[in-house]
Amino acid sequence: MQGAGSRGAWIHSPSHCPGNGHGSPPAVAPQRRRLTRRPGYMRSTASPGIGFLSPAVGMPRPISAGLTGQEFYPSQSKARQCSLDLRSHCQDSLVGNPFLKGSLGPAVTSVGHLHPAQGSMRERMVHSGVHSGNDRRQSERLTGDSGCRQEFLSSDSSKSLASSLDVAWSKGSRGLKTVRPLVSPASNGPVDIPSLPGFQDTFTSNFSFIRLSLGAAGERGEAEGCLPSREAEPLHQSPQEMAAEGSGSDRPHGEPRHLWTFSLHAAPGLVDLAQGTRSNRQPECGMVSSSDAGFSSQDASPAGGRSDQDGGWADAHGWHALLREWEPMLQDYLLSNRRQLEVTSLILKLQKLQEKAVEDGDYDMAETLRQRLEDLEQEKGRLPWALPSQQPALRSFLGYLATQTHAALHGAPQRAGSDDPEAPLEGQRRTTAQDSLPGLAVTRRDWLMREKEQLQKEIEALRARVSVLEAKEQRLSQELEDQEMLLRWQGCDQMALVAQLSPGQLQEVSKALGETLTSARWAPFRVEPPETLRSLRERTKSLDLAVRELTEQVCSGEKLCSSLRKRLADLDTRLPALLEAKMLALSGSCFSTAKELAEEIWAVSSEREGLEMFLGRLLALSSRNTRRLGSVKEDYLRCRQDLALQEAAHKTRVKANTVKCTEVLEGQLSCCRCPLLERVWKADLEACQLLMQSLEIQEAGSSSHVEDEKQVHSTGEAAQTAALAVPRTPHPEEEKSPLQVLCEWNTYSASLPHCAAGLWKEESHVVFAEVGDKCEAIGMRLLHLEDQLLGAMHGHDEALFQSLQGELQMVKETLQTMFLQLQPAKEAGGEASASYSTAGAQEAED
C-alpha cells in the first residue's frame, strides 16, 4: 500500500500492519491515478497520512436500537468489513456536506479513500456549523443509519467528533492546526490496540535541500490533481511543533481510550485551488448559514474572502455608509483634477490659435486670446493637482482607519491562540480593541486638552513670575545704586565731627535728615508730564501735521481747478470764433479752409470734453479732501482742548507741590542750626522759587501769545477790509462794465456791417480777457481769505472769524454779479455774430 502518494488515507486497522496473518486487500479504486514515485530517502515506512485508527478486534460496540449489553467482533474480517462499511457510510454522508476542500484534505484522509469517480464530491468545501444545532446535524451525518452506525462511536464521542470538526474548520481556515482527542466509550476491559508505525513516524530532515525537495514533490502532486500528502507538512511546521505533535500522538498501547486525531491544516495553495471549484459549485453546496456570518474579515479564510456568494466583507452596510460619506469629497477632488486637465488642453488650443492669429495679422484676436490665456493660467494656478488620498481630511481619516485596523489585527491572534479546546465558538466575535478605539480617541483628546490648559496656566504663572522678578530687579537695582553711592563716601570718616555734637544736637540732626530724605521722594522737581499727557501731545502733533497736508492738497486742487476753468474759458472763447470762421469759409466756397477749421473745431471740442471730465474728477477729489479736512480739524480741535485742559491741570499740581515744598523748607530753615543741612535747604528753596518763576512765565507767555495772535488777526483783517473797502483807482475805460462795453460796441458796429464780425471777435476777446483777469484776482483773494480763516480757527478768535465770513460773503456776491453781467454779453455776442454772418451771406449772394 503506497499511502505516500495517495490523496486519501487508509482506514488503518491491525490487519493492515505488517506481520499480521489476517491481512485484507485494500479498498483501492478501480481507476486509480498513477503518481510519481519518490526517491528512497523521501519514503516513509508506512502511510504518512494522518487518519483515525479503526477499532481492534474485541472492541465493544454499543447497540443503539434499544438493546442492552455489548457485542464483540468475532474476527478481524468482520472488523475489516465494518471498517469498509464505515468508509462507505462516511463517503455518503460527506458528499452532501459543503466542506472546504482545503480543510477537507486531511479530514478525508482520516475517513477513508474515496473513489476517483467521486472527485467532484471530494473537491467540495466542508461546511462546519458553529452552534450546537450544526454540531448535532454533523454528528448525525457521521453516525447515521448506515451499516456501521454507532458501532465505534457512542453519542458522546460523535458529539466530540463534531465539535472537533467545528473547531478545526474555524481555526483551520486561519492556518492553525488543531488536534482533538475523541474518547471511545469504556469497555469491559482494556483493549490493546497496536499503534501504526506510519501514524507516528513522519519523515523529517535537518537538510534544507531535502525539505525543498519535499515541498517540490507536494507541489507536483497538487499540480496533477492530488492533494499534497502529510509528508510535506513539516515544511510548514517548526521542529518544536513537530516534536509536540509526535509526543501528543504517542499513546500507550494498553490505553482503554484511544485517540482519533484530525488535522485540518489547510495549505494556502489548497485554499486558492479550492476557490475555482467552489465558485462553480456554490449553488450545489449551499450557502453558509447565518450563524457563520459572525466571523469578521480577519476570521475568514482567503478563499472565503474572495467568494462571490458571501460578499467578501463583514458588515458591508458600514462600508457602504463610509463610501456614501466620502464619495462627494472624492468627486470634488477628481473634478478639480479633471478641470485642470481641461484647462491645460484649452491653453494648448488657444496658444495655437494665437500663433495663427499673429501669422494672419489679426492682432486684435491675438490680444483677446492673450488675455484669455492669462485667465486660464491663473485658474490653473488655483487648481493644484494632488491625489485624493493625500488631501488633509481624507488622509487624516485613513490614518485613523489604519489605527483601527492595526488594533484589530493585534486582537485577532489573541482569539486564535486560545488554549481551551472545549471553549464554544460564538457567532459574532468582535475585538475589544476595535470597540475601545473611539473611547481611547476621546480619552486622548481630553488628555491633550487638559495638557494644553495646564500649559496655559503654567505660562500665565511664569509671566506673573517674570513681572514680579522684573519689579524685584528694579528695586534691587535702585538699592544697589544707593549702596554704591554710600560706598563712595566710606573713605570720608565723619565720626570725629559727629562725636563733637551733644545728644540734643545729634537728635535734631537725625530728625532733620530723616525729614529731608522723606521729602526727597515727593520732590516737585519731577515736572515731567504723565504718560497720558505725552500720548495726547503726540496725537495732537500728528493731527496738526495731517491738517497741514490736507490743507495743502485742497489748496493745490483749487489752484488746478482754477487753471482748468481758465483753460475751459479760453476754449469756450475759441469755439464760437472757429464756428464763425467756418461759416464764412463755407459761404465763400473755401472748402479746404472749412475742412481745416472743422478739424480744429473737433480738436478743441475733444480737448474741452476731456478737460471737463478731468475737472469733474478733480472737483470730486477736492470735495472729498475738504470733507476729510473738516473731520480731521474737528479731531485736532478736540485734542487741542483736551491737551490744554490736561496741561493746565498738570501745571496746577506742579505749582501746588512747589508751594508746599517751599513752606516745608522755610520751616526747616527756621528750626535747624546745622550748617550743612541749612545750606542744602537753602538750595532747595531757591530751586523751588525758580520753578515758580518758570511756571509764571509760561502762563504769562501763553496768555501773551494768545493776545498777540488776536492782535495780528485783527490787524490783518483790518488791512484786508481796508483794501477791499478802498480799491485802487481804475482807468476810465476800466470803470465800464462789460455790458456797457458791449452796448457801445453794438452801437458802433451798427454802421459797419461788413467788418462787424472781425471787430466783434477782437472786442469779445478783450472783454473775456478782462473778465478772466478779474475772476482770477477774486479767486486769489478767496484763497487768502481761507488761509486767514484757518488761522482764526486755530487761534480761537471768534471776532476775526466772523469778520472773515462777512468778507467772504461779499466776495461771493461780487462774483455772482459779474457772472450775471457776463451772461447777457455772451448772448449778445452770439446774436451779433449770427446777424453778421447772415448779412455776409446775403451780401455774398447779391
Curated annotation (Swiss-Prot):
The region called Disordered is annotated at 1-53, 127-147, 231-257, 277-312, 409-436
Compositionally biased spans, kind Polar residues = 277-300
Task: Give the originating organism.
Answer: Rattus norvegicus
Stretches for region Required for localization to punctate cytoplasmic foci: 429-587
Superkingdom, according to UniProt?
Eukaryota
Induction per UniProt is: Up-regulated during neurite outgrowth upon differentiation with NGF.
Region labeled Interaction with PAFAH1B1 — which residues? 721-846
- Record-annotated disulphide pairs: none
* Name assigned to this protein: Disrupted in schizophrenia 1 homolog
Q: Per the UniProt entry, what is one GO biological process?
A: mitochondrial calcium ion homeostasis
Q: Which Gene Ontology cellular-component terms appear in the entry?
A: axon; cell body; central region of growth cone; centrosome; ciliary basal body; ciliary base; cytosol; dynein complex
Tissue expression, as annotated, is:
Expressed in brain, heart, kidney, liver and thymus. Within the brain expression is high in the cerebral cortex, hippocampus and olfactory bulb and is also seen at lower levels in the cerebellum (at protein level).
Coiled-coil blocks = 440-489
Q: Where is the protein situated, by its record's location annotation?
A: Cytoplasm; Cytoplasm, Cytoskeleton; Mitochondrion; Cytoplasm, Cytoskeleton, Microtubule organizing center, Centrosome
Where it mainly occurs, coarsely classed, is: cytoplasm
Q: Where is this region: Interaction with MAP1A?
A: 1-288
Record field: compositional bias (Basic and acidic residues): 133-143, 248-257
Region (Necessary and sufficient for interaction with PCNT and localization at the centrosome) spans which residues?
435-846
